[in-house]
């Protein structure tokens, strides 16, 4: 995980300090800024990607409701569209990339590290399946089935 921008200023037209203040007032376990804004390779249609981790005890409906509320609230803190995701609902490779390269907005480093270890283990366990799917896709492309 990339270290947070300690001065709390903006990253590519994102008011990181304001987003941190807002998220600190919620019950998210942690939040990460990730994607093109962190990598520094934005273009005019780039959005602002934020992954949230909610408490485990929340129902799927409550997680959805809270994510939508936070998503709406954060729109004013960036020039582009803010795309807020529940990290538990992200595809495994994207969640892993957010944990590897993202910037911590709020949350405890130990909790983020523990979740990262869990995602890494799951990623390794499913490597053969991903490789099989990739090869099948390439074969279908070569045959003109896609």
Model-derived regions, located:
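Catalytic core of pol beta-like nucleotidyltransferases
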Residues: 1-26, 30, 39, 57, ...
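Catalytic metal-binding acidic patch
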Residues: 35, 40-60
């Amino acid at each position: 995980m990339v270290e947070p921008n300690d001065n709390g200023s903006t990253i590519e037209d994102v008011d990181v300090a304001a987003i941190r203040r807002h998220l600190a007032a919620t019950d998210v376990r942690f939040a990460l800024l990730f994607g093109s804004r962190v990598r520094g390779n934005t273009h005019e249609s780039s959005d602002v990607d934020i992954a949230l981790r909610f408490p485990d005890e929340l129902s799927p409906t409550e997680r959805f409701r809270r994510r939508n509320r936070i998503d709406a609230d954060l729109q004013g803190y960036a020039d582009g569209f803010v795309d807020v995701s529940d990290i538990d609902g992200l595809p495994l490779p994207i969640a892993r990339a957010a944990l590897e390269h993202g910037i911590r907005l709020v949350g405890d480093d130990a909790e983020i590290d523990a979740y990262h270890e869990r995602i890494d283990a799951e990623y390794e366990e499913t490597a053969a399946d991903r490789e099989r799917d990739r090869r099948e896709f390439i074969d279908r492309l070569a045959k003109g089935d896609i």
